Every structure is written in C-alpha cells, then in structure tokens.
Swiss-Prot record:
Protein's organism: Coxiella burnetii (strain Dugway 5J108-111)
Cellular location(s): Cytoplasm
Chain spans, region A: 1-344
Assembly and interaction partners: Homodimer.
Record-level Gene Ontology MF annotations: ATP binding; ATP hydrolysis activity; ATP-dependent protein folding chaperone; unfolded protein binding
Protein name: Chaperone protein HtpG
NCBIfam families documented for this protein: PRK05218.1
GO CC aspect terms: cytoplasm
Length: 633
C-alpha cells in the first residue's frame, strides 16, 4: 500500500474555475452569505456524524457535544469557522472542494454555453456552498480529519481561488473541519463581532447546532490576565424552527431555513407547515422552489425530504415521502413514531411512512390548489418551472388523479399564445351545448400544433382544442381518459365525430363518397404499403389532405418519441384523408396521365406527413417530384 504524498498541487476542474469566477463577481452585492453557506456546511457535517454514529458510537471519539465555532483575528485579518462534525478524508477533500458533483458537471457546462441563464440562476441551481468563501477572501485554508481516522491522517487544503489548490498531510488531533478565511483588503467589516452576530441571527438562527463565539467584553472589564481563556457564548437560538407554532415564525425565518436545507440561493415560491397529532404524530414543513433544479428530469437522481425522528437528523433525500411527480418538493419531516435506527430499506415497507406520505401529498396539492385559485401569477410561475413534472401525476397517483387533473394547464386555440394557462375546467366552461368531449392535439412543437390542418373544421365551428407539445403529454393523455364526465379525444386519431355539431358535413361527405370511389382506389394502388387506408374527410376546409391514425394505434407523435429513445415497436401506418372540395384534389381526380397522377399522389401524402410533423424518409425524391410537377404546370 503506497503512502499518500505529503504535499501536492492540483488543478481545479474547468467548471469549478468558472463557478469561482461567477461567485467572486456576481455575488458581491450579497457577500455576507459566505458565512451562511459555511455554517450550513458545518451543520450538514454534524448531521452526517450523528447519523453514522447511530451504528458506530466510536465515531464521536468521546466528544458528542457538537458545535460550530466562529472566531476572528483582527491582526491577521482572518475569520475561522470550525466544527466537530464528520470531517473529510483526503479523497473527500478532492471530491468536495475540487470538483462539481459529476451529475451536475455536464448541465453546468451546457448552461454556461447557452449564455441564457443569469449568474444567479447558475448559482441557485448548482449551489454556492464552500466556494462562497472567495467572495470575501483572497486565500482560504481548510484543515480537516474524518471521524474514525487517525490523528496523523488530517488534511490541509489551501487555495487563492484561481486555477490551483495545494494539499498536504497534517496532524489533527480532533475530528471535524476548520475553514480559515484570509480576508481581502476591502472586507474589514467582517472583523467586527457585532457584524458577525447580526449575520448569524439573520441567516442561521434556526440551525439546530449551537453556534459559539467569544463573549464581547464590556468597556471597563478587567483585561489584566491576557492568558485567560475567553468565555464563550451561544449566539443562535439553536432550536428546531419547525416545532414552533406557525404564528411565532416570521416569513424571513421560513425562507432562510429553506435556503439552508435546499442549498438554494433564491427564496422559495411557497411553503406549507403542518403538525399532525393523535395516533400518529409528525410535523412537516414543505417547500416549493422558485426554479427547477438542473437535474429535474433525472428520475434516478437524489430527491426527497430531510427526515428527523424526535428532532434528531436521520437522513437527507428521504425519497419515500413524496411521489416522483412531486420530486421537486423540498422540506422536513419530523416524526415521533419512527425508530432512530430506521434505514432506507425499512422506509419502503413501513406503514407509518405510507401515512405520512399521503399527508405530505395532500398538503402539497392543497397548497397548489390555493395558489391556482388565489394567486394566479405565482401559480403561473410554478407551472412554468414544474408543470411538465406535475403532468406525470395522473399516471402515478390514481387516488389523486382528479385533483391533479384540475391543476393541469395547457395552451389552446382559445388563446393565441404558447403560454399554458388553460385549465380543463376553463375548457369545459366554454364547450358548445352539443359538445361532449374535450378535444386535443399532441405535436412536436406548439407552432406545429397550432398550424395543423386537423384544426380546420374546429376553427370553422369555433370548437376549442387543447394544443399539447410537451414530451410528457402523450404519457399524460394515455392515463387521463376523462375529466368531470367529459372524455378526452385526440383529433389526430380515428374518424372525426363531432356528433350533432357536424350533421350537415356528414350528409355532404356521403354524397362525395360514391363520386370519389374510383379516385380512392387509385390512391391506394399508387401509395400501397406507405398507408393503411385512404378516405374522404370533412375535417379539412383549406388543406387538400391530412394524415391520421387508427383510434387504437399510436399517434405519429408518440411513434417519433419512441424512435428517438431507441424503442423497438411495430410502427402504425397513417391513414390519408382527402378534402373532396379542394382544387388540387379535383385536379388530380381529372388527371389522365398516369406518371403525373403518381407524382401528385406522392406529393399529397408527403405534404400531409410534413404537416403532421413527420420527417420524410426520402426528402430528395420529394423535392424532385415537386419540381417536376411545377415544370409541368
């Protein structure tokens, strides 16, 4: 076994360099948050030690009195944040202080490359954390040792926040981490004990761990004994905010607790605080973030709530309290009815967990319902951030399907905008008296849906159609068949059936069918295996053709999604529908030249496929045939 080098210099990952630059230049107006972030890290370290010590008490090393110490030295211009939490090994120092978590590296790079995200958005998504130290410091030294390791396995990390950092082995008799900030010339304000106390009160009063500082000496106090150990005092409340009555907690305190537990830079969008008493006793404090995290679509990523048992931290990311479609929710569950040594495996089959989960879901859905009813602007912000995730709900949560459906929002032909602000209840309130279905179309983009020829008869009759273009929409409509007794109907599948709304058109179509029987046979003969069928339609008013799919087959949009994800399936063939009143169809009907007829048949099918969003298998042949028809005209 080779010994670790005594000292070495390593380079930061490229993403860390960029994050350091952002932190140093973009957070200067709110520079005091460095203390909040470093205290939060120390608090997390204590939580991890408590949890691991449940199964290995020796990790406490005869010191179970966990604290955070804050000190400063005016002469040397330093601030020190020290804890006796879990600490770090050499490998953990490199992983935690030299890299961004691998799950976030690619997303961070993509956001930077796009140049779309504001600096605050990047910082909010990836966390400021330890790197906030460089807002006020031009040199940072970290000394740490992991609990359970030998005293000579301590590590010292040092950097000026530029391209490199140095590591060396040190002796560290006590476990935990010490962060020493060498302040920039312009940051003397933080060498004031009153200023530091004010920041702690503002951001970290709720931290469960005692935060300790030296007592401020009053003027005239005896200062003769220079060697006397200064007296210490706890400068935060050090209690669990969530156990206090709601009327005793200020909004700012709720917001700061959120930033601590979610490691977010922004205020939450909304929250709900609830205490349940009776046979089952637990407290929940649940937050909805203002912005989606970078890994929201990684269903395997870390998610969940912080779990406490009788105010003792048990685990981060306890995913069993929230279904996948609410994976964006952050917060705390504190139960009196779970054992302290509960594991993730036991969480899966615990009846108490199931009851708490049902309560958490109920609270979040009620919060969203309240926002949707009483604060439409805030709900619109929520929908923009998390609407696509909520659309997974009807497939995953049958018990709450109707409540979730009532929260869904869509674009529609009623509004000339891609903003998703139409609820299913809005749609029903505008339905025609004779109408008994909720009509929708799913397309690759909003523009493609809005301009689909399939909408022509609906516009003619002033029937609203929901315009869906999110990737999750096919999954949604497959599991949401009806709402308030009205069935959902795709206008891109099956034959058109508007009931009493289309009596005249049906009569007219029947007249055309005999006259166009020969033309339909010719189309079938020419197009062969490319199509399933050809038929007359009355759904078109301006376009010559369109394609649809059988009622029980997958839509073209769903088939394209499956192809993109590499799925193996039996592809459905389109049905070509023709508008018997369109001049192009009448021209083709009278075409006597077989070659030209074949070109027209191909052209009419391909343009219908393009309008449906399909990518042509042979676009060059399509262009060639089109050019030949233009030259013949």
């Amino acid at each position: 076994m080779s010994l670790q080098p005594q000292s070495e210099t390593l380079s930061f990952e490229a993403e860390v360099k960029q994050l350091l630059h952002l932190v140093a230049h973009s957070l200067y107006s709110n520079k005091e948050i460095f203390l909040r972030e470093l205290i939060s890290n120390s608090s997390d370290a204590a939580d991890k030690l408590r949890y691991q010590a449940l199964s290995d008490a020796a990790l406490y090393e005869n010191d179970a009195d966990l604290k955070i110490w804050i000190d400063f030295d005016k002469d040397n211009r330093t601030i020190t944040i020290r804890d006796n939490g879990i600490g770090m090994s050499r490998e953990e120092v490199i992983e935690n202080l030299g890299t961004i978590a691998k799950s976030g590296t690619r997303a961070f790079r993509e956001l930077l490359a796009e140049k779309k995200a504001e600096d605050s958005q990047l910082i909010g998504q990836f966390g400021v954390g330890f790197y906030s130290a460089f807002i006020v410091a031009d040199r940072v030294v970290v000394r740490t040792r992991r609990a359970g390791m030998k005293a000579d396995q301590g590590v010292e990390w040092e950097s000026t926040g530029e391209g490199e950092y140095t590591l060396k082995n040190i002796d560290k008799p006590t476990r935990g981490t010490e962060v020493v900030l060498h302040l920039k010339e312009s940051e003397e304000e933080f060498l004031d004990p009153l200023r530091l106390r004010a920041i702690i009160t503002k951001y970290s009063d709720h931290i469960l761990l005692p935060i300790v500082m030296k007592k401020i000496k009053t003027s005239g106090a005896d200062d003769e004994d220079k060697n006397e150990t200064p007296e210490e005092e706890v400068v935060n409340r050090a209690n669990a905010l969530w156990v206090l009555p709601k009327d005793k907690i200020k909004d700012e305190e709720y917001k700061e607790l959120y930033k601590h537990i979610a490691h977010d830079f922004e205020d939450p969008l909304a929250w709900v605080h609830n205490k349940v008493e009776g046979k089952l006793e637990y407290t929940t404090l649940l937050y909805i973030p203002a912005r989606a995290p970078f890994d929201i679509w990684n269903r395997e990523g870390q998610r969940g709530l912080k779990l406490y048992v009788k105010r003792i931290f048990i685990m981060d990311d306890a995913e069993h309290f929230m279904p996948m479609y609410l994976r964006f929710v952050k917060g705390i569950v504190d139960s009196n009815d779970l054992p302290l040594n509960i594991s993730r495996e036991l969480l899966q089959s615990n009846e108490v967990i199931n009851k708490i989960k049902a309560g958490c879901v109920k609270r979040i859905l009620s919060l969203l319902e309240d926002l949707a009813k009483n604060d439409k602007e805030k709900y619109a912000s929520f929908w923009k951030a998390f609407g696509q995730v909520l659309k997974e709900g009807p497939a995953e949560d049958f018990a709450n399907r109707d409540r979730i459906a009532n929260l869904l929002r869509f674009a529609s032909t009623h509004n000339d905008t891609d903003e998703q602000n139409v609820s299913l209840q809005d749609y029903i309130s505008r339905m025609k008296p004779e109408q008994n279905r909720i009509y929708y179309i799913v397309a690759d983009t909003y523009t493609s849906a809005k301009n689909s020829p399939l909408l022509e008869v609906f516009r003619k009759k002033d029937i609203e159609v929901l315009l869906m273009s999110d990737r999750v929409d096919e999954w949604l409509v497959a599991h949401l068949n009806e709402f308030e007794g009205k069935s959902l109907q795709s206008i891109a599948k099956g034959t058109l059936d508007l009931g009493d709304l289309e009596k005249e058109e049906k009569v007219e179509t029947e007249k055309f069918e005999k006259d166009f029987d020969e033309l339909l046979k010719q189309f079938k003969e020419v197009l062969g295996e490319k199509i399933k069928d050809v038929r007359i339609t009355h759904r078109l008013t301006d376009s010559p053709t369109c394609v649809v799919f059988d009622e029980n087959e997958m839509s073209g949009h769903l088939q394209r999604l499956l192809i993109q994800t590499g799925q193996d399936f039996m592809q459905a063939k389109p049905i070509l529908e023709i508008n018997p009143s369109h001049p192009l169809i009448l021209r083709v009907k009278n075409e006597s030249d077989k070659t030209r007829f074949n070109r027209w048949a191909d052209l009419l099918l391909n343009q219908a496929l393009l309008a449906e969003g399909e990518q042509l298998k042979d676009p060059a042949s399509f262009v060639k045939g089109l050019n030949e028809l233009l030259l013949d005209s």
